[in-house]
């Protein structure tokens, strides 16, 4: 992506949002105030902008462009926001440029999720623009509180649309989003990540339903990474729900699973156990990273690392036998 695509005057302004749903969102300033840039983070950005860190990459160049726009005071926000709502272009630009570092801060939290940092920033900038267009200063909260929600939405939507190879039915996506949004809201109020029981209580839903959807979300997030080569498919693609397939498709899926099981035994014992427990093979029920770690006495991060190593080794085994990843799939 070109450096110039991130300049404010070249950003697209027609991001696709469902405004009917977003208008009903409740923005909690106390819950989101942590997303405002801290002094240390702003100092870090300024050092990057000045090229203090080694290697003047595109991120540093971009930070150099935005690093000298001062943050607005609360009074200035109200002044410029009112003028922006009346169509004053310079005020709108001032609102955007003064909050570009907020986008960078939030975008950094989504690193290693399938998109480069500059791509995340560009998506977040679209959310910032929309926030400026819709911000009502008379409602009494700071602009950064309001903008944070829009920035998150555009970044998360981009990650979902550009990195997922699994497409869920729309009613499942909507239900899952309700649970995830509730989990985020609770995490701001509590001093820990909410459990399935706490989410279920908040929504007055059965705990089993919430647990099932949260497991589904983790499997999609961690398993939908392409296995490699020329294939865009992932391991979860071939472990499909038999209830959604016809008899012929079910037979093909069974053959695929048997092939995977055979190659699993060419991995080392730890890789084989982790993959089997994660994806419901060798008699195990599919489990989350946390559950697998609990069962075998490892941290969640170590389980994830072993999973990545195992999938990489599985690809090497296939290639050594003259097979491609596509050999596991039949349309």
From Swiss-Prot:
Superkingdom of this entry's organism?
Bacteria
Q: Which Gene3D superfamilies match?
A: RNA Polymerase Primary Sigma Factor, Winged helix-like DNA-binding domain superfamily/Winged helix DNA-binding domain
Q: What are the BP-aspect GO terms? A: DNA-templated transcription initiation
Q: Which UniProt keywords apply?
A: Cytoplasm, DNA-binding, Sigma factor, Transcription, Transcription regulation
Provide the residue span(s) of the region labelled Sigma-70 factor domain-1: 57-90
From the UniProt annotation, give the residues forming the signal peptide: none
Q: Cellular component per GO?
A: cytoplasm
- Using the UniProt annotation, give all residue ranges assigned to the region (Sigma-70 factor domain-3): 175-250
* Biased amino acid composition, Acidic residues: 15-25
Q: Which CDD domains match?
A: Sigma70_r4
What's the chief localization of this chain?
Answer: cytoplasm
Region annotation (Sigma-70 factor domain-2) maps to: 95-165
Which residues, as ranges, make up the DNA-binding region of this protein? Answer: 289-308
Which residue ranges does the UniProt annotation give for the motif Interaction with polymerase core subunit RpoC? 119-122
Q: Which InterPro entries match?
A: RNA_pol_sigma-70_dom (IPR014284), RNA_pol_sigma70 (IPR000943), RNA_pol_sigma70_r1_2 (IPR009042), RNA_pol_sigma70_r2 (IPR007627), RNA_pol_sigma70_r3 (IPR007624), RNA_pol_sigma70_r4 (IPR007630), RNA_pol_sigma_r2 (IPR013325), RNA_pol_sigma_r3/r4-like (IPR013324)
Q: Where are the stretches annotated Sigma-70 factor domain-4?
A: 263-316
Q: Into which family does the record put it? A: Belongs to the sigma-70 factor family. RpoS subfamily.
Q: What is this protein's function? A: Sigma factors are initiation factors that promote the attachment of RNA polymerase to specific initiation sites and are then released. This sigma factor is the master transcriptional regulator of the stationary phase and the general stress response. Required for the normal expression of the enterotoxin, yst, in the stationary phase.
Which protein is depicted? RNA polymerase sigma factor RpoS
| Source organism (scientific name) | Yersinia enterocolitica
């Amino acid at each position: 992506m070109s450096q110039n695509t991130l300049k404010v005057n070249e950003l697209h302004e027609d991001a696709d949002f469902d405004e009917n749903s977003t208008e009903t969102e409740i923005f909690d300033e106390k819950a989101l105030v942590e997303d405002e840039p801290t002094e240390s983070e702003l100092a870090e950005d300024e050092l990057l902008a000045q090229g203090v860190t080694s290697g003047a990459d595109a991120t540093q160049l971009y930070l150099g462009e935005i690093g000298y726009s001062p943050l607005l005071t609360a009074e200035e926000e109200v002044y410029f926001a009112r003028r922006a709502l009346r169509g004053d272009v310079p005020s709108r630009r001032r609102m955007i440029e003064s909050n570009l570092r907020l986008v960078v801060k939030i975008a950094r939290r989504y690193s290693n999720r399938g998109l480069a940092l500059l791509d995340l920033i560009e998506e977040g900038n679209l959310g910032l623009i929309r926030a400026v267009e819709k911000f009502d200063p008379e409602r009494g909260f700071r602009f950064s509180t309001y903008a944070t929600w829009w920035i998150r939405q555009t970044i998360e939507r981009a990650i979902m649309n550009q990195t997922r190879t699994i497409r869920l039915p729309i009613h499942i996506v909507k239900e899952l989003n309700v649970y995830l949004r509730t989990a985020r809201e609770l995490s701001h109020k509590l001093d820990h990540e909410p459990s399935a029981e706490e989410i279920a209580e908040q929504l007055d839903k059965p705990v089993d339903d919430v647990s099932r959807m949260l497991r589904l979300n983790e499997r999609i997030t961690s398993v939908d990474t392409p296995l490699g080569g020329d294939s865009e498919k992932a391991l979860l693609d071939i472990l499909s729900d038999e209830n959604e397939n016809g008899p012929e498709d079910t037979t093909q899926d069974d053959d695929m699973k048997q092939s995977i099981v055979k190659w699993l035994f060419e991995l080392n014992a730890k890789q084989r156990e982790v993959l089997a427990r994660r994806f419901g093979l060798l008699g195990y029920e599919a489990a989350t990273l946390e559950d697998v770690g609990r069962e075998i006495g490892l941290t969640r991060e170590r389980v994830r690392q072993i999973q990545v190593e195992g999938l990489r080794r599985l690809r090497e085994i296939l290639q050594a036998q003259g097979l491609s990843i596509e050999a596991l799939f039949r349309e």
